[in-house]
Amino acid sequence: MTGQRATPQPTLDDLPLRDDLRGKSPYGAPQLAVPVRLNTNENPHPPSRALVDDVVRSVARAAADLHRYPDRDAVQLRSDLARYLTAQTGVQLGVENLWAANGSNEILQQLLQAFGGPGRSAIGFVPSYSMHPIISDGTRTEWLQAARADDFSLDVDAAVAAVTERTPDVVFVASPNNPSGQSVSLSGLRRLLDAAPGIVIVDEAYGEFSSQPSAVQLVGEYPTKLVVTRTMSKAFAFAGGRLGYLIATPAVIEAMLLVRLPYHLSSVTQAAARAALRHADDTLGSVAALIAERERVSTALTGMGFRVIPSDANFVLFGEFTDAPASWQRYLDAGVLIRDVGIPGYLRATTGLAEENDAFLRASAQLAATELAPVNVGAIASAAEPRAAGRDHVLGAP
């Protein structure tokens, strides 16, 4: 203001922030206007005209009641989700087995509000999804971690040993894992469930791409332990809609009612998600094409000399680069945005449309000639401690 001395803007250090949050890095993924965006594992196929029209009609109907609060428990949406999952998994589910929220991250947060918190701990097997430790920190749940195998797969023996030794209240298992892409078999999950003293959260964000049966099949066997989380952001091509959900015994849904905020899912979100579910067969028809493209990309990268981690999702983790952040920048300079997930020597690329994958492979061929390194023996050990990952600052985010 004129005539007054400008007051310096306060920084984060000037605020009475919780001590355990000081020095933490927020979630971050570049959102850049580039020709090819392969960094956040979205479904590259846009919604069909029929789906868009259905969403518009559904939201218009919901808009007529915007002066009223939405269905607090999203009963119709949860019923639709139960029907979809019953058809997909063969497991008979009802509204009492489903809970929905604004993306699977809110689901994970609610789970830790209910089953984690001060004096409790959660364990994950790294490298894995970066939001697991971030949400643990936010709910003041002690974060524990154990390393994956040298190929980034889950060493079930080592995982069981870590759970047995450290007795966490919550166990996180991503299947398929992000950022490496491997799924965990039902037999492996059973061993973890048998060893775990508390809740086991199987994060199936990429479940529709997996070659393994869904962990939903085990909910009846482990009703007091198992929670399966999923999202409509990946295979469902509904990332902009922000809808996540969980499958569990009805008692877990009762626990969610204790911690959820009232009216947490807007009437617009509920209407749009229900419309998307009505077009599930059409939308999920792209999954087979994306899997075929993933395999084409993996084969081409291998032929160029890259080490490609076998994937069961809609992305591939590949290396080994002498300087992954520098290589990430070279991809960006070529108009291709991929992901530095914080694993030394490795980058991750989403499977896009055929023409997007072709552009990515052209850039990869140029980099393969100059930027590949011998096998990085220390990659796993280094990845066990999160670091500032080039431009992303996270491990294995969406």
Curated annotation (Swiss-Prot):
GO terms for biological process: L-histidine biosynthetic process. SUPFAM superfamilies: PLP-dependent transferases. Residues 1-10 have a biased composition (Polar residues). GO terms for molecular function: histidinol-phosphate transaminase activity; pyridoxal phosphate binding. It catalyses: L-histidinol phosphate + 2-oxoglutarate = 3-(imidazol-4-yl)-2-oxopropyl phosphate + L-glutamate. InterPro entries: Aminotrans_II_pyridoxalP_BS, Aminotransferase_I/II_large, HisP_aminotrans, PyrdxlP-dep_Trfase, PyrdxlP-dep_Trfase_major, PyrdxlP-dep_Trfase_small. Residues 1-30 are annotated as: Disordered. Its EC number is 2.6.1.9. Homodimer. This is Histidinol-phosphate aminotransferase. It comes from Mycobacterium avium (strain 104). The lineage of its organism: Bacteria, Bacillati, Actinomycetota, Actinomycetes, Mycobacteriales.
